[in-house]
A protein has these predicted regions:
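Amphipathic alpha-helical segments within well-ordered protein domains
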Residues: 53, 75-79, 92, 107
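Short, surface-exposed recognition loops or helix-turn segments adjacent to catalytic cores
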Residues: 63-73, 91, 172-176
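Acidic, His- and aromatic-enriched active-site or binding-groove loops in soluble protein domains
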Residues: 83-111
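Short, conserved secondary-structure transition motifs
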Residues: 68-81, 96-102
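Positively charged, Gly/Ser-enriched RNA/tRNA-binding surfaces
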Residues: 1-62, 107-176
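Short C-terminal domain-edge/linker segments immediately following a structured domain
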Residues: 40-44, 64-67, 96-99
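N-terminal entry module detector
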Residues: 53, 65-66, 78, 82-87
Length: 176
């Protein structure tokens, strides 16, 4: 009773929220899940992104943004900015609010949580600079220097380059 490796699963179905729905969020909704287990290389990441972009393209969506992230890059950015390793979880919880409260709100909440204003400013400035530099992994790797393991930036570059080379519809890739 062993699963093949890699194991791939696709399911589409109704799901329900356990929590109380908020404005614009429904208790029941349809969701698509694609899972790949047991693939240690970047191929799983590439395949998942391509499945998503191909599907969106066939549904007629164009000019959308695929947002990818890598926790080790966020950690390197936090270390570069002066946050202590034991504070990363708190910093990332606040950072996750970026879409709701904006960069200024994130910066303010970091400071309100007791973090140095200089660290908060430096951290948020990195995101602005990254956007200004076209979400370039090479730029970020150079900027972060020894704070970022070379393997991390190489893997992310491989994923982005592979997806861009085979893209099935018009879309942008952004580090988020």
């Amino acid at each position: 009773n062993e699963l093949p490796s890699p194991f791939k699963a696709l399911q589409i179905g109704n799901v329900w929220r356990a929590d109380r729905p908020q404005r614009g969020r429904y208790r029941q909704f349809m969701q698509c899940d694609i899972d790949i287990l047991g693939e240690p290389s970047n191929l799983a990441e590439i395949e998942l992104i391509l499945a998503t972009t191909t599907t969106l393209g066939k549904l007629g969506f164009q000019d959308f943004v695929i947002r990818i992230n890598e926790r080790r890059i966020l950690k390197a950015m936090a270390a570069y900015s002066g946050f202590a390793e034991e504070d990363y979880d708190t910093v990332f919880i606040i950072l996750d609010k970026m879409d709701k409260i904006g960069a200024d709100g994130v910066k303010a909440e970091l400071v309100e949580s007791g973090f140095a204003a200089e660290a908060a400013d430096k951290y948020m400035a990195l995101f602005d600079e990254l956007t200004a530099n076209g979400n370039s992994v090479a730029w970020l790797a150079e900027k972060l220097g020894d704070f970022l393991e070379p393997e991390v930036s190489q893997n992310l570059s491989e994923i982005i380059d592979s997806v861009r080379a085979t893209k099935a519809s018009e879309f942008e890739i952004a580090f988020d």
